[in-house]
A protein has these predicted regions:
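SAM-dependent methyltransferases
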Residues: 1-14, 27, 33-38, 53-57, ...
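Short, glycine-rich nucleotide/cofactor-binding loops
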Residues: 13-22
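Short internal beta-strands
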Residues: 38-47, 51
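Short hydrophobic/aromatic-enriched beta-strand-loop microsegments
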Residues: 40, 57-68
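General beta-strand structural signal in soluble alpha/beta enzymes
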Residues: 42-44, 61-63, 87, 115-119
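Mid-chain, well-packed structural core segment of small domains
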Residues: 67-105
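Ser/Thr/Gly-rich flexible loops in soluble cytosolic domains mediating phosphotransfer, phosphorylation
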Residues: 93, 101-132
Length: 133
């Protein structure tokens, strides 16, 4: 495998949440809307809809996870179009799209894109990750 080149930050964050974590994601977004408002947000279907209902306008929605949304976000990761991924997942649940989830997580590792799977990690990334102007 080739050595990865340094990626230019684009100011894009992907947001994904399993059903049992959507309320946590919405609360996280509301608690950090001053910072998140400076980024272009990309979200899977229902997660994006719930975030948009809070009044944030800087969000692009993709399909819901089971309908290919996780794979769409994975494509953004592979193309270098996302700086970090916040995926609040339910680690105890089974999901019909588990292969897509595993692929997304693998792509984050391959392309060295920071991946937060819980609020604490997302908070650390958001506060300590520089955004190119």
């Amino acid at each position: 495998m080739k050595e990865q080149k340094e990626r230019k930050l684009r100011g894009n964050i992907a947001l994904i949440a399993h059903d049992g974590k959507k309320a946590d994601m919405v609360k996280f977004v509301m608690d950090h809307r001053d910072i998140l408002g400076e980024y272009q947000l990309h979200a899977t279907g229902t997660t994006g809809q719930k975030i948009a209902e809070t009044g944030l306008k800087n969000i692009i929605r993709y399909n819901s996870g089971p309908y290919g949304g996780d794979a769409e976000i994975g494509t953004l990761v592979a193309k270098g179009e996302v700086d970090m991924v916040f995926f609040f997942r339910d680690p105890l649940g089974k999901h019909p799209h588990d292969p897509d989830i595993a692929t997304l997580m693998r792509l984050c590792d391959v392309w060295e894109v920071p991946l937060a799977t819980n609020k604490s990690t997302a908070r650390l990334l958001l506060r300590n990750f520089p955004k190119n102007e």
